[in-house]
Regions:
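Conserved structural motif at the start of ABC-family nucleotide-binding domains
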Residues: 6, 23-27
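The feature captures the beta-strand-to-loop junction immediately N-terminal to the Walker
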Residues: 41-43
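Helix-to-loop junction immediately C-terminal to a conserved catalytic motif
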Residues: 56
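Conserved ABC transporter NBD signature motif
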Residues: 64-72
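Conserved ABC ATPase "signature" region
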Residues: 105, 120-138
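Conserved ABC ATPase signature
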Residues: 142-146, 150
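Catalytic Walker B motif of ABC-type/P-loop ATPase nucleotide-binding domains
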Residues: 167-171
Length: 312
């Protein structure tokens, strides 16, 4: 059974001002386990980055507790915290004249002392971290020559080289194409299992998070933070109500979202297999509701002819 690495009790986050305090979210109670990938979802401006910065100790909390490995986060020194939490940010780093191995080696900074000289053990950790994310072939490449996906893997390798039990990532798939997004999410899930680390990330890639994450945090201004597995949040209606808006419908059977088209007409559609599915999709995209049980004068057969019907 995975152990609880992070414990959050009645957490309040936001920004203190001169005359008042802006509370972004409060009353957050949760635990984040080792060996799990947890994804934070929410609309722009809801406070995902504020929550992530607070959990990372980049900004102070307004109230409540954040405990990492049983210890209140505020009792850690900066040096101690650098051996507990590693963070991968969204911003692209414009690095020139630095190789992949050298950048990953910076993850050893909490252990190398003032001069930053890597020991053989440090070099072994760097090499192992590069191997874990599957980029040994990039080890001697210059960072500025890498693609966005390659660069993100390097930053994850750097976080692994830091050897912390907790890794936070701020929208790690933000600049990636779809195949790279899938690969990145699968990699992070695999790493959480293989290394038994606590990996927590914010993302806008809803569909991928629902298919890959172990736990989901849904954050909105009305309800604060709702937490559960994708399956639990589907069964209790949290996902459907969280994203309820015109044009979007949550399908509880697949656990995914689909576009809810407005229909001007309908046809009875016969057939089976992929041809039937693609024809139904094409018709519905064009405002025509189609299905086997639809009662309509127009009948379309996708894989043959029927009396009074059309062959497609």
């Amino acid at each position: 059974m995975n152990s609880e690495t992070i414990h959050i009790e009645n957490l309040s986050i936001g920004y203190p001002g001169k005359n008042d305090v802006k509370v972004v979210a409060d009353g957050i109670c949760a635990g984040i386990n080792s060996g799990e990938l947890t994804c934070l979802l929410g609309a722009n401006g809801v406070g995902k980055s504020t929550l992530l910065r607070t959990l990372s100790a980049f900004q102070p909390k307004l109230g409540g507790e954040i405990r990492i490995q049983g210890r209140e986060i505020e009792t850690y020194t900066d040096k101690q915290l650098s051996r507990v939490i590693s963070v991968v940010l969204t911003e692209k780093c414009d690095l020139r004249n630095m190789s992949v191995t050298e950048l990953v080696g910076l993850g050893r900074t909490p252990y190398t002392g003032f001069w930053g000289v890597l020991t053989q053990e440090d070099k072994h950790v760097v090499e192992h971290s590069i191997a874990l994310v599957g980029i040994p072939h990039l080890a001697h490449r210059m960072v500025h020559t890498l693609s966005d996906g390659e660069r993100q893997k390097v930053m994850i390798a750097k976080a692994l080289a830091q050897e912390t039990p907790v890794i936070y990532l701020d929208e790690p798939t933000a600049f990636l194409d779809f195949p790279s997004k899938v690969e990145m999410m699968q990699l992070l899930h695999h790493l959480s299992r293989r290394t038994d680390k606590t990996i927590f990330l914010s993302t806008h890639d809803l569909e991928l998070a629902l298919q890959i994450a172990d736990k989901i945090w849904l954050m909105d201004k009305a309800n604060g933070v709702t937490i559960g597995t994708p399956e639990d949040l589907s069964l209790n209606g949290s996902l459907g109500s969280f994203f309820a808006r015109k044009g979007i419908v949550f399908d509880p059977e697949s656990g995914l979202f689909r576009v809810d088209n407005e229909y001007a007409s309908q046809v009875r559609l016969s057939g089976s297999g992929q041809r039937y599915a693609m024809m139904r999709k094409a018709l519905q995209r064009n405002g025509i509701f189609a299905g086997r049980d639809v009662e309509a004068e127009t009948h379309v057969e996708t894989d043959g002819c029927t009396e009074g019907g059309d062959k497609v």
